[in-house]
């Protein structure tokens, strides 16, 4: 309840809907009108825009040693580069990715690494924002992206979406 009330009161949630995990552990906002889809073996959560289907939001949750803190994995830039090398564009994938920005942010006793990428996938230029955070033996990677042509129209909203990811308990 605090998640929605604090975010709604800030005015940053215009055009966004709230999502809370079934166990109440985390929540975030996603763009109004987007649809959740399920992909076997894929991310824990995926939403996409019905009209602009290449606009997507995803949450990947992976196990990590319970004693590991995010800062132990490296700086924001190092973690961003590791994501590029191992997940987004591993060798042989044919993808080209550039890390544009990497920052550290703290919220509710958690450290978040906010990342911004430009990607070339199958001759399509994309722009993505992601945040990475560690909590209770899991590493969460929450990302939202679109094609480069729409980036300027959705940049502020996507920034609000990525920064809305938070732990509620």
Predicted regions and their residues:
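Conserved polar/disulfide-associated segments of primarily extracytoplasmic proteins
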Residues: 37-133, 139
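Short acidic-hydrophobic surface loop/beta-edge motif
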Residues: 17-22, 103-106
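Bacterial signal peptide processing site
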Residues: 9-11
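C-terminal motif of bacterial Sec signal peptides marking the signal peptidase cleavage site
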Residues: 4-7
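Soluble non-cytosolic domains of exported or imported proteins
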Residues: 25, 73-81, 148, 152-156
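Proline-anchored loop/turn motifs at beta-strand termini and strand-loop-strand connectors
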Residues: 23-40
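Surface-exposed amphipathic alpha-helical segments
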Residues: 34, 138-169
């Amino acid at each position: 309840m605090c998640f929605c009330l604090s975010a709604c009161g800030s005015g940053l949630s215009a055009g966004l809907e709230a999502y809370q995990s079934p166990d109440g552990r985390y929540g975030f906002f996603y763009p109004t009108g987007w649809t959740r889809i399920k992909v076997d073996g894929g991310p824990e959560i995926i939403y996409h825009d019905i009209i602009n289907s290449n606009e997507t939001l995803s949450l990947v949750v992976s196990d990590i040693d319970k004693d590991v803190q995010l800062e132990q994995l490296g700086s924001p830039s190092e973690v961003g580069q590791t994501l590029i090398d191992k997940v987004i564009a591993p060798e042989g994938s044919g993808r080209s990715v550039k890390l544009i920005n990497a920052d550290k942010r703290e919220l509710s006793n958690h450290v978040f690494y906010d990342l911004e990428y430009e990607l070339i996938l199958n001759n399509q230029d994309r722009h993505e924002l992601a945040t990475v955070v560690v909590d209770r033996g899991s590493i969460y990677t929450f990302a939202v992206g679109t094609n480069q042509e729409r980036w300027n129209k959705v940049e502020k909203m996507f920034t609000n979406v990525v920064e809305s990811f938070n732990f509620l308990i």
